[in-house]
């Protein structure tokens, strides 16, 4: 397969700089700070003298450090990707719980003959949440001796050689990165729905209906209609009204998430009666400023809005501040609107059935469920509700195989992802 070097924006001058950096990596010497065309042959000759093994290993490290790390952030769902420092601050999260203001007036409720100590203890209440997953990526590519010989013969050949290596690694890593990010988002969407559908959660009366909006049902209720999804999409007048209603509702969600409340997220459970009739949560209050709100929407739906309604409907003073990304498909490109997955979610309460009797208990652990959603329109969430981080990337090359004249370059990378259902999230369904 031929590779066009310009696909990755790599010029001959840049290729020379990469070779220069690799030479320095292998030998500790920097030949020249700015590599001109006339200087190319001399450094190529010196590189050959260093040896294929050292140069390939050094080149592998330089490409990984200089190019692949930068390119890794161009995959879809890029706003989910966090740096190691950002991700580290999320993994072990301490949340402080508001306590009620003491009743009475300490400065006026004073009686003669009584002592009043200023050393009263009022401990702060806090909880720690940690939700995370881990995986590892390995990839490798083989380079032959005659490729090196050809690559070091001219600047244009080196350009094609390095671009070929980068194209191979870049395509694979980008695809892996996108799939991990997609899975992270799918789990957030499906997990939010699974929480509200959980029988124990419903039995204890701690569902969060505002976290999952059934927009078609809402539309039919508000307008006194009984439209199906297909009928709504086919009716220009009804669809226009639906889109305008949706813009208003999204504005409302943005404003509500910006307030510090217990809405749009799950709170841990403090206690629950055996029959589930009385559940006491530990009320976590969250707020999501607009700059911290992420929004992913199904692209085919927005294409229809632009064509049928009007292009600027969702470019108003509120929505223009959302990190608004269109998604071509959630899980399968052939059925872009559907999600069908096994998901994990935060489950505060557990229910046990024995002899036709259901008893409830505090759980505050993870739950698992199979979720099938026929039409996911979008999701709006705090940027701490879902995150993914790539770290510990490194590469190395094997010695040259003397019998067959090749060596293999390996690249390794760790992937960590997380969902936090105690952060604000709202799933928009067209059902």
Task: List PLM regions with ranges.
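A structural detector for beta-sheet-dominated domains
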Residues: 97, 144-146, 363
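Intrinsically disordered, low-complexity boundary segments flanking structured domains
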Residues: 77, 127-130, 280-284, 395-397
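Extended, solvent-exposed, turn-rich assembly/linker loops in the middle of proteins
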Residues: 194-342
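Assembly/oligomerization interface modules of large self-assembling protein complexes
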Residues: 54-141
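Long, contiguous amphipathic alpha-helices that act as assembly "spine/axial" helices in icosahedral shell
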Residues: 128-200, 406-413
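Extended, compositionally biased alpha-helical segments that mediate assembly or anchoring
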Residues: 1-70, 299-431
